[in-house]
Amino acid sequence: MAQSPQVLLSALADESAFDLTAVEQFTALAALGLEYYSLRFIDVGKGVKNVMKLSLPEIRRIRQLEDRYGLNVASIASPIGKTKLVDVDDGTRNAFVPFERYLARDVARACELAHAFETKLIRGFSFYPPKGSAPADHLEQAVDRIGRIAEACHRSDLTFGLEVEANLVGRDGHLLAEIHRRVNHPGLVLVFDAANLVVQGFSTAQVWSQWEAMKPGLGWVHVKDYRKTTARPRAGHVEEGKLADFVPADRGAGGHARILADLHGFLPALTRRLKRRGIPGVFVDLEPHLRGGGQFAGTSGPDGMGIALRSLCGVLDGAGIAYHLRDFDDLLAARGLG
């Protein structure tokens, strides 16, 4: 019998913890059987920090805890690209940073962190155009910046993953796919997230269309879902802090069953392509927001993360996609008895 293609399960670790301490995050993920996590917000004893703000002693302590809990970093879940594209007052609280400074400081820092945590992947975004403006009007400027970020990552032997999300230039799958096509760089891949489309008012059929548009550039998948509503117009600005109807992957309007069944067909080829860049495989990264989400983070708690993981595993089983959760053989190997 042919072996089923396999994904690597991961999660935004901070979603699994109420207080965001490293021990709380890692305990939850290890208990769920995960071996990979994406690093975003964490408390290593000096308060909660974004990964970009971690000190060298904090990095060393996290690495020690990773060894203790048997975890590896899937991606640096950075906020790169969540700044204004244009320095205008548009009524938002988004910051503007001159791009040359941003490239030399923030992007370089993200690359340093990826090497420190021994991952090949940095997650980022496609910049905020002025609120109320047409994203297509800012495509050329976004393409230029993202291309330079991709080149910086590539020169560091890393890959930049561009996530689809509301309010950005690449707010839908077609725009993000066009950015990827124009940048045309091996250091750039796309990160699909169904809920980030549903919250904008897109139907399940429209989410599918955007998945198809993103497939040629796909690098990995974020999994969260949202209960369909009709109260939110597609063209409008999404107030991310007010979103409250996130659900597991088998209950929302994102169409994960069809999407992951489709992934099954090209998963072996995508895995081979990523491995040529030193990436261990195709990550399916849980970011469920089951207790709520906002512009820069969300929370699910340890129980919510467990609910989300079991839901995802059921959808993967239905799609015929294999995955691995830690078992007794892994525990024996960790004890040196395997």
Where are these regions (language model features)?
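Surface-exposed, active-site-proximal loop segments in enzymatic domains
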Residues: D43-P57, I80-A104, S126-H138, G236-V247, ...
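Active-site beta-loop-alpha junctions enriched in small/polar residues
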Residues: L12-S16, R40-V44, S78-G81, F127-P129, ...
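Short beta-strand segments at enzyme active-site cores
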Residues: S38-L39, V73-S78, T119-S126, T159-E163, ...
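Ligand-binding grooves and catalytic loops that recognize ribose/phosphate and carbohydrate rings
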Residues: K46-G47, E58-R61, A205-W211
